[in-house]
């Protein structure tokens, strides 16, 4: 199944490694990780990012909240089961 991240981005739920709140996860470790992986970051086009979605191939800055994305992922998982 696929999940819509906002900004016209859709990813496979199988490729998602984690969904994180943008503001809550700006620890030094996360900042270092994002700097090292900056070539994989896909920035949010519409407004301020509210969440970070880490996938196998890319890191997306999403304008949708992490709780909204979590609900979408759970819904897709329930449909898939």
Swiss-Prot record:
Protein name (record): Extracellular matrix regulatory protein B
Origin species: Bacillus subtilis (strain 168)
Superkingdom classification of source: Bacteria
Role, per record: Regulates the biosynthesis of the extracellular matrix and the biofilm formation. May act as an enhancer of biofilm gene expression. Acts in parallel to the pathway that governs SinR derepression.
Disruption phenotype: Mutation impairs pellicle formation, complex colony architecture and motility inhibition in a sinR mutant background.
InterPro entries tied to this protein: RemA-like
Gene it is expressed from: remB
């Amino acid at each position: 199944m696929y999940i819509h991240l906002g900004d016209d981005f859709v990813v496979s739920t199988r490729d998602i490694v984690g969904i994180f709140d943008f503001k809550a996860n700006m620890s030094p470790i996360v900042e270092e990780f994002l700097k090292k992986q900056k070539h994989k970051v896909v920035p949010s086009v519409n407004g301020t990012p509210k969440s970070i979605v880490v996938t196998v191939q890319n890191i997306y800055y999403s304008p949708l909240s992490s709780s909204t994305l979590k609900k979408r992922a759970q819904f897709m998982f329930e449909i898939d089961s």
